[in-house]
UniProtKB/Swiss-Prot annotation:
Cofactor(s), by name: Mg(2+)
Active site, UniProt feature: S107 (phosphoserine intermediate)
Protein name listed in UniProt: Phosphoglucosamine mutase
Modified residues (Phosphoserine): S107
Length: 451
């Protein structure tokens, strides 16, 4: 039986519409609290404690209060971190030996969306069976704990400062960032009071943008999903590099001094090359079905095995664990370095890239010399919820035609989003015009069949 509420990255939707409503989120907090309280890891006679962090959406206040009430009703204590990047919640949950962490965020989505995602005590995303147990509790009546058994809530002192120090600890002690001018784009999101301090305290001349959240402007024309603002700022300020995070700061895009943008695929290659230089060998790395073919070829040329996971950082993580490897990434900017953090972290990933540049004495362009990405065209087609795109003969025919034309010189990938009713059509080809033409033909077939 499939999960009803949990997608690839927690529970997400439009605020005010199921399931992102205050009554549902209260019941979700209660259900999660009951599952935690019944865990074998909670000592008899003690009560679990969870950490709640959020991004800067106006709805975060409402959902935070609802979650807090639900946990308290289940007899679970709550610590409130306030605005905090998703990887910051994962780190603090592990560092403070808490029972779980919860993030209120819809990541790169606009302000009118929000979501809830959970981390286990070790800072990893919840396993499927735990999410299933929470969903099962949602069907049960809410039975409030007795007055002397209610959970308590308190603010976590200096949550931001604790996480800042963790981020800095992942940068080599022998290095500093003095002499570097960096533009840091925080997407008006959760890292707005954190990321600029990390890079400044390591010595960089920091020019922050996207650091004036008002509850409504998260990811709006700024951040990792809208890098044009960063490109302009890097050029205008004659900066050495630009670093763009998304709303919850688990994604990274980098811009060099010329305005060239580097995505997660390219940054993965840079980190693997750096690891080879320092450790002598990297057995393998993980990308996704969307990873550019040129990166796979380049890694294999370096003697590095490459595995493609399903799209979603949780699936990249699964493959890394299965193979015992450290480095993986998505083109969207989720980068995993498991010897540094248990989850994707935009700030930590940026520091790893900067350390690689320091060690090599090269620019990003120089480190990627010889890696020419195949042109890709990605079209997101919004569908009616529940539309049967897999059963459409017209969509299948369009895909077959494109694959036949690109045989041996490109790829076609069609997949449904795990967080919204969108079908992602991606075509990769040696010639950009071919990628665009085939992607648009398939997208037209999808629109005709599903809207």
């Amino acid at each position: 039986m499939g999960r009803r509420y949990f997608g690839t990255d927690g529970i997400r939707g439009t605020v005010g519409e199921g399931p992102i409503t205050p009554d549902f989120v209260l019941r979700l907090g209660y259900a999660a609290g009951k599952v935690l309280a019944s865990s074998a890891e909670v000592a008899a006679g003690s009560r679990p404690t969870v950490l709640i962090g959020k991004d800067t959406r106006v709805s975060g206040y409402m959902l935070e209060a609802a979650l807090e009430a639900g946990f308290s009703a289940a007899g679970v204590d709550v610590m409130l971190a306030g605005p905090m990047p998703t990887p910051g919640v994962a780190y603090l949950t592990r560092a403070l030996r808490l029972s779980a962490g919860v993030v209120i965020s819809a990541s790169h989505n606009p302000y009118h969306d929000n979501g809830i995602k959970f981390f286990s005590a070790d800072g990893n995303k919840l396993p499927d069976d735990t999410e299933a147990a929470i969903e099962a509790w949602l069907d049960k009546p809410l039975e409030c704990a007795s007055s002397d058994g209610l959970g308590k809530a308190r603010r976590l002192d200096d949550a931001a400062g604790r996480y800042i120090e963790f981020c800095k600890s992942t940068f080599p002690a022998a290095f500093n960032l003095r002499g570097l001018k960096l533009v840091i784009d925080c997407a008006h999101g959760a890292a707005y009071q954190i990321a600029p301090h990390v890079f400044h305290e390591l010595g960089a001349d920091v020019i922050p943008i996207g650091v004036a959240p008002n509850g409504f402007n998260i990811n709006d024309g700024v951040g990792a999903t809208a890098p044009d603002a960063l490109v302009r700022a890097v050029r205008a300020n004659h900066a050495d590099l630009g670093i763009a995070l998304d709303g919850d700061a688990d994604r990274l895009q980098v811009v060099d001094s010329t305005g060239r943008l580097y995505n997660g695929d390219e940054l993965l290659y840079v980190l693997v090359k750096d690891r080879i230089a320092t450790d002598g060998k990297v057995e393998g790395a993980v990308g996704t079905l969307m990873t550019n073919l040129a990166v796979e070829v380049a890694l294999q040329r370096e003697g590095v095995k490459f595995v493609r996971a399903a799209v979603g950082d949780r699936y990249v993580l699964e493959q890394l664990r299965e193979h015992g490897w450290q480095l993986g990434a998505e083109g969207s900017g989720h980068i995993l370095s498991l010897d540094r953090h248990s989850t994707g972290d935009g700030i930590v990933s940026a520091l790893l890239v900067l350390a690689a540049l320091k060690r090599s004495g090269q620019t990003l362009a120089q480190m990627l010399d010889g890696v020419t990405l195949f042109p890709q065209k990605l079209i997101n087609v919004r569908m009616k919820p529940g539309a049967d795109w897999k059963g459409s003969t017209s969509i299948r025919a369009a895909i077959d035609t494109a694959e036949a034309a690109l045989a041996g010189s490109g790829r076609v990938l069609i997949r449904a989003s795990g967080t919204e009713p969108v079908l992602r059509v991606m075509v990769e080809a040696q010639q950009a015009a071919d990628a665009v033409r085939h992607a648009e033909t398939i997208a037209d077939a999808v629109r005709a069949a599903t809207t």
